[in-house]
Amino acid sequence: ASTGRVVAHETLSRIRREDGTLMGAGEFVEVAERMGIIHKLDHLMMEKAFARMAETDYQGLLFINLSPRVLVLGEFLRETSRLVEFYGIDPGRVVFELTERDTVRNFQVLEDFVNDLKLEGFKFAIDDFGSGFSSYHYIKRFPVDYVKIEGDFIVNMLRDGRDRAFVRNISNLAQELGIRTIAEFVESEEVLEAVAGTGIDLAQGFHTGRPSETLTPAEAVPPAEPG
């Protein structure tokens, strides 16, 4: 978080209305889930993202948010593996993430899904880490590569010592386990400095980069080593 290097991007889904304005994911994801077509949107988004990676020879990581519905879709991994092979993408540079609140519904299904994900060479991240009651159980049970720390902890770090303590302890534990940490909602230089001071590996937020249709050249991230 202290080097200023770009090493990753996260995909964001948007739909352009007829008047040219953009509709955010929060406006259509739930509708797509109810209609049973969210997996089709996920597939379309991934195909566009992988094509862009191939066109630009992008070398960084790409984080992709998953709907919990994919956990029960057997064709998801087959289709995703087919896409990365078609576009010549190293699956180790693709990180699929689920929010912590989405992981609590069926541990066995999630465990099977993550293990299959890892067998195909992809990476796995837990988003909003620390927002639920089972955070540490996840990183004990699942082969997690990244944890994205709940943004509320990050935005309050400068004025709340308890939040700083939470972030520091998550960072220390993750380092011991060989898991990389990402601070979300980093929106000022002061917060970035505070995050770097706790040993967090990567930072994400408006201060480090805003949504864009282009891929900023990125460097490869070396693997984390257990402490």
Q: Where do the language-model regions lie?
A:
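Short beta-alpha junctions and helix-cap segments that line functional grooves
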Residues: 25, 110-113, 135
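Conserved, function-defining core regions and hallmark residues within catalytic/recognition domains
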Residues: 28
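EAL-family c-di-GMP phosphodiesterase catalytic domain
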Residues: 1-7, 14-19, 67-74, 93-108, ...
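Catalytic-core regions built around general acid/base machinery
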Residues: 80-86, 112-120, 169
